[in-house]
Amino acid sequence: MRKVKFFLFVITVCALFASCDKMTNNGNLDGMWQLISVSYNKTGGEDSIVNVKNERVYMNFQQKLGQITPGTFRTDSMGRYLLMRFEKKSGLLKLHDFYAFYETAGPLGTERHSEEKLLTDSATTLLQPFGIDGLFANFNILKLTGSSMILQSDYAKLVMRKF
């Protein structure tokens, strides 16, 4: 009987260590990032640099899902926050499939309803404050450490710090 209990204990411990743990290949990208500045690329002129540190814009990356918390740039058409899919491969970060997440309260705040809407208008300017022109973005990862990240696309350069 004692051997059976010990065997069951060993099996239980092994199952606990082997279950429900997903590892990502995102490295330092995973986590919450604060957008510090956006430099919009100008053709034939100087880049326009916008300091957005005090606007409370955050980007979160986990597994293959990203989230943008718009801070003071929030509008009704944007919703509470934006969700997106992303792919990170060999120095390139691709952002796509953006969703606006809406949350409304019922009478006297008793019920909460949430809804996600896929952004489909290819001419949207909704994402431009975050350095994204249109419905997708391809960023070259210029720098990615445990504390800072710099992304560069044809449209903008983003400087972020780990939060």
Language-model region placement:
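Tryptophan-anchored aromatic micro-motifs
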Residues: 28-46
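Transition segment at domain starts
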Residues: 35-38, 48-61
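Bacterial N-terminal signal peptides that target proteins for export
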Residues: 1-8
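Signal peptide cleavage region of secreted peptide precursors
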Residues: 21-24
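Contiguous, well-ordered beta-strand patches that form the walls/edges
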Residues: 39-45, 61-144
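C-terminal motif of bacterial Sec signal peptides marking the signal peptidase cleavage site
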Residues: 16-19
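C-terminal/domain-terminus segments
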Residues: 85-87, 151-163
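Short, exposed beta-strand-loop hairpins at the edges of beta-sheets
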Residues: 138-157
